[in-house]
């Protein structure tokens, strides 16, 4: 009560921010007549003038009024569009490292030109981040004339572009691209073998469009580049045959997992657990199939991988539904994004889940992948010096933006008042009753010429509504993951009188729905239209536009509440753009997923008390409140998951930054001989200490063991025993010095053969390859540690602290291994002629190019939240790293010729 009173007196923080910024808007407006007097050349010359002022030490913020006034005037001349005052406010919010909440249709794309221009003046580059390639290309091409008029360069960063084209795109003043592509380029740059292979500059300013989708919805999905691991597709097929014999348990006794069924499903956490009966049955079936030996337990250490296959197969059958979570197209399982309803070509679930779904659907099973490099969006975007974003719905997630990204949210007012009518929810007992009510509402609305947009949460639901509309004889368009090639065109015409469009979630986001349809799309469909044709199309559109406004504007129907209020608000936000008329209503049933999981008992009890009859709906503030509470529960749970993922990833992030920093230093120097000499001393000291403990008696020395170790690991055949026999006075310290001196001498002889320059080149290559190899193994070890660390909680230990402690120990051990393996490899390698070294380098480059061409980046999403992976196939290897080396040495390939690949 007191807070509300204070807010009334002093205004909210949002009000105070906007009040401060409106003073600057007044200054910009006062400059408008002065800007109008400038010629095109004088206006273009302002960019060079601003840059000169910045070089002399002027602060960027001081340029805001004049720079924004220049962009507004340039926009008037190039596009014939003038930035509204609210767009100037939005531009200032975005420059202040904030999230700007701007309603749909308020011109976010044009608003973004203001801070993009201002921050591009520094010459450090601006990255405009969009949710898909179509929007990146559209926005770049639409805004290119404006930026080029002002003397700035524009680049587009798309998947599959060759490195030189990417480098050129990143060198531009303003670069447009998707969040995935920026993240993957960062990871690829940190896997490069020479400075020339890198494409990104230092990360300066990121302007994220649809920021809620990228920084929140996708925050649980780490970007991962991975290569193929061993083939286990046959095992997935064999285990898949067993699963249909298991029966799902309806009521789970979480304490004992006892009951009639064989497995229980927890829909909240998206997990499946075997019951005791299920464990007995599955062990019998595994023995019968010859997969497991009689008398063995599925939980024994020897069967860990088998348990992994069983769990993945159970989840595939019990939790993942065709045409809801994925579709099958051209013999491939393609994931459907739960947030947008779009298909995500190439994206793959991790932990063997995708392979299990492929086995379930009977399509070809692709190999599992091994992580080569990874980063979460949370940690990638925090690498930028300056981060800002815009969306139509951010206020509900303001706390998360603030706590994780340190970004304040500012709600920017609309240019015209919002007059859309948001009608109360209607709740029915069954889904069939709900669908029937939706059909009746659509009939009523279209009869008076009102366009309707129906939002569904899955392809399955969109097809269900579509079938019912077809039966009722209502013409409609379906926009879902199966047919989104012409997405923008369908969305653009969704405002046509009496048009009915069914869209999964927020498919088509980024394209405005214009009342009366898009006259521009009609003009674009004609070949060489005349002025008369264009005028007629415009006149026809105006008649349609007025008719739709008269009918009540665009009506939004939500067929279910989403887990997040923000997604519901996004659907509603498609109507009522720029002060247009509109309305919205959500239809719910007690069979909806959200109601069933979170609100069913309380609300259904309430409905029974009210004596509900079939076909009747309940419309009451209590019900609306119960639904809002259910959504808050889910949002809170999802926030906790994302926060927990970040806390764990922060540990890996510190290590990642250390490794990538070290790696970049290595790439940028040509001579690492000093580092090698320092490492050699450390390695030989540690090796000798293991056999000749410091300050120990000679009887405690293991000379045969030391000789064997030096021979096997460093190719040093030293007669240490003879030295000690011939020189009894030879003490420990002198012996250490002699062994080290011998190793240096042998190494110098190698250097004389190939030349110092070649040896420096080779040393650098070995260090980089060894670092990459060990880092890859370390990532896998960290992943295993992360998966089981929660069990430490049963021993009254804090899993996060345990994870930090153990991962640090593993990291320290990896650095020691790095030193040892670098010196071991350099000591054992036999190089005879400079030509051989050159040939080796040529082979490595050709192989790197081949792998780069074969690389298919794919983004995975795992509902279990903590670990998902974005896989990049990097080609098949003929010899596995742990296979015997083909040279016949008897050693593992990775410890022999694999070093030189």
From Swiss-Prot:
Q: How is the cofactor bound?
A: May bind 1 zinc ion per subunit.
Q: Which cofactor does it need?
A: Zn(2+)
Annotated spans, Disordered? 859-901
Q: Give GO cellular component annotations, separated by semicolons.
A: cell envelope Sec protein transport complex; cytosol; plasma membrane
A single Gene Ontology biological process assigned to it is: intracellular protein transmembrane transport
What's in the keyword line of the UniProt record?
A: ATP-binding, Cell inner membrane, Cell membrane, Cytoplasm, Membrane, Metal-binding, Nucleotide-binding, Protein transport, Translocase, Translocation, Transport, Zinc
- In this chain, Zn(2+) is annotated as bound at 885, 887, 896-897
Record EC number: 7.4.2.8
Q: Where in the cell is it found?
A: Cell inner membrane; Cytoplasm
Q: Which domain of life is it from?
A: Bacteria
Q: What is its main location?
A: membrane
Q: How does it sit in the membrane?
A: Peripheral membrane protein
Catalysed reactions, semicolon-separated:
ATP + H2O + cellular proteinSide 1 = ADP + phosphate + cellular proteinSide 2
Instruction: Give TM regions.
Output: none
The entry marks the following residues as binding ATP, namely: 87, 105-109, 512
Q: SUPFAM superfamilies recorded for this chain? A: Helical scaffold and wing domains of SecA, P-loop containing nucleoside triphosphate hydrolases, Pre-protein crosslinking domain of SecA
Which leading EC class covers this enzyme?
Answer: translocase
Its protein name is Protein translocase subunit SecA
This protein's species is Escherichia coli O9:H4 (strain HS)
Kindly list the organism's lineage. Bacteria, Pseudomonadati, Pseudomonadota, Gammaproteobacteria, Enterobacterales
Name the encoding gene, please.
Answer: secA
């Amino acid at each position: 009560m007191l807070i509300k009173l204070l807010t009334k007196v002093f205004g909210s923080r949002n009000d105070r921010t906007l009040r401060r910024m409106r003073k600057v808007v007044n200054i910009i407006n006062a400059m408008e007549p002065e800007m109008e007097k400038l010629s095109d050349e004088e206006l273009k010359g302002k960019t060079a003038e601003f840059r000169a002022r910045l070089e002399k030490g002027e602060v960027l913020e001081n340029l805001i009024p004049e720079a924004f006034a220049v962009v507004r005037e340039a926009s008037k001349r190039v596009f014939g569009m003038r930035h509204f005052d609210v767009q100037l406010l939005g531009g200032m919010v975005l420059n202040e490292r904030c999230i700007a909440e701007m309603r749909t249709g308020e011109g976010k794309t044009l608003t973004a030109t203001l801070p993009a221009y201002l921050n591009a003046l520094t010459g450090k580059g601006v990255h405009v981040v969009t949710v898909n390639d179509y929007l990146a290309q559209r926005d770049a091409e639409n805004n290119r004339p404006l930026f080029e008029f002002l003397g700035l360069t524009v680049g587009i960063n798309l998947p599959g572009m060759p490195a030189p084209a990417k480098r050129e795109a990143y060198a531009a003043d303003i670069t447009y691209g998707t969040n995935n592509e920026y993240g993957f380029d960062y990871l690829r740059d940190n896997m490069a073998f020479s400075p020339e292979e890198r494409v990104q500059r230092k990360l300066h300013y990121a302007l994220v469009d649809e920021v809620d989708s990228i920084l929140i919805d996708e925050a649980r999905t780490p970007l991962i580049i991975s290569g193929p691991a061993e083939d286990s597709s046959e095992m997935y097929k064999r285990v898949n045959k067993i699963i249909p014999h298991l029966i799902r348990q309806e009521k789970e006794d979480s304490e004992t997992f006892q009951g009639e069924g064989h497995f229980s499903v927890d829909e909240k956490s998206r997990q499946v657990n075997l019951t005791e009966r299920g464990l007995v049955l599955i062990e019998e079936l595994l023995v019968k199939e010859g997969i497991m030996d009689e008398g063995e337990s599925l939980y024994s250490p020897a069967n860990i991988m088998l348990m992994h296959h069983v769990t993945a197969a159970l989840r595939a059958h019990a939790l993942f539904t065709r045409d809801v979570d994925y579709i099958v197209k051209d013999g491939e399982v393609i994931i459907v994004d739960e947030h947008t309803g779009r298909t995500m070509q190439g994206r793959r679930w991790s932990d063997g889940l995708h392979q299990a779904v492929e086995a379930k659907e009977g399509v070809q099973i692709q190999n599992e992948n091994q992580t080569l490099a990874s980063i979460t969006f949370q940690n990638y975007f925090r690498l930028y010096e300056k981060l800002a974003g815009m969306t139509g719905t951010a206020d509900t997630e303001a706390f998360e933006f603030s706590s994780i990204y340190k970004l304040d949210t500012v709600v920017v007012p609309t240019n015209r008042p919002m007059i859309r009518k948001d009608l109360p929810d209607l709740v029915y007992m069954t889904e069939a009753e709900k669908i029937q009510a939706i059909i009746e509402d659509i009939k009523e609305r279209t009869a008076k010429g009102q366009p309707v947009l129906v939002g569904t949460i899955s392809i399955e639901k969109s097809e269900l509504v579509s079938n019912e509309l077809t039966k009722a004889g209502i013409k409609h368009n379906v926009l879902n993951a199966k047919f989104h090639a012409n997405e923008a065109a369908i969305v653009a015409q969704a405002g046509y009188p009496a048009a009915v469009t069914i869209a999964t979630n927020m498919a088509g986001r980024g394209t405005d729905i214009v009342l009366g349809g898009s006259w521009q799309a009609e003009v674009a469909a004609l070949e060489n239209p005349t002025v008369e044709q264009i005028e007629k199309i415009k006149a026809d559109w105006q008649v349609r536009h007025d008719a739709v406004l008269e009918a009540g504007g665009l009506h939004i129907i939500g067929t279910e509440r989403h887990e997040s209020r923000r997604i519901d608000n996004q659907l509603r936000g498609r109507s009522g753009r720029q002060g247009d008329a509109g309305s919205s209503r959500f239809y719910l049933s007690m069979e909806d997923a959200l109601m069933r999981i979170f609100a069913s008992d309380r609300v259904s009890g309430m409905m029974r008390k009210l004596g509900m009859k079939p076909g009747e709906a309940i419309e009451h503030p209590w019900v609306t409140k119960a639904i809002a509470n259910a959504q808050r529960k889910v949002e809170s749970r999802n926030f906790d998951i994302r926060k927990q993922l970040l806390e764990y990833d922060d540990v890996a992030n510190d290590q990642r930054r250390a490794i990538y920093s070290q790696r970049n230093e290595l790439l940028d120097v040509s001579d690492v001989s000093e580092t090698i000499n320092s490492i050699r001393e450390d390695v030989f000291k540690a090796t000798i200490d293991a056999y000749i403990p410091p300050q120990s008696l000679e009887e405690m020395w293991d000379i045969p063991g030391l000789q064997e170790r030096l021979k096997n690991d460093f190719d040093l055949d030293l007669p240490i025993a003879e030295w000690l026999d011939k020189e009894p006075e030879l003490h420990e310290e002198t012996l250490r010095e002699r062994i080290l001196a011998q190793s240096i001498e042998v190494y110098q002889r190698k250097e004389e053969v190939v030349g110092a320059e070649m040896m420096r080149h080779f040393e650098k290559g070995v260090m980089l390859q060894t670092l990459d190899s060990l880092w890859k193994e370390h990532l896998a070890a960290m992943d295993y540690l992360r998966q089981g660390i929660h069990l430490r909680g049963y021993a009254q230990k804090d899993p996060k602290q345990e994870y930090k402690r153990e991962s640090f120990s593993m990291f320290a051990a990896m650095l020691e291994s790095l030193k040892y393996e670098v010196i071991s490899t350099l000591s054992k390698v036999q190089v005879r002629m400079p030509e051989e070294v050159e040939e080796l380098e040529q082979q490595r480059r050709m192989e790197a190019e081949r792998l780069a061409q074969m690389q298919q980046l794919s983004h995975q999403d795992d509902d279990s939240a903590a670990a998902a992976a974005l896989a990049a196939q990097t080609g098949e290897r003929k010899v596995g790293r742990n296979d015997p080396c083909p040279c016949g040495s008897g050693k593992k390939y990775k410890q022999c010729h694999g070093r030189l690949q």
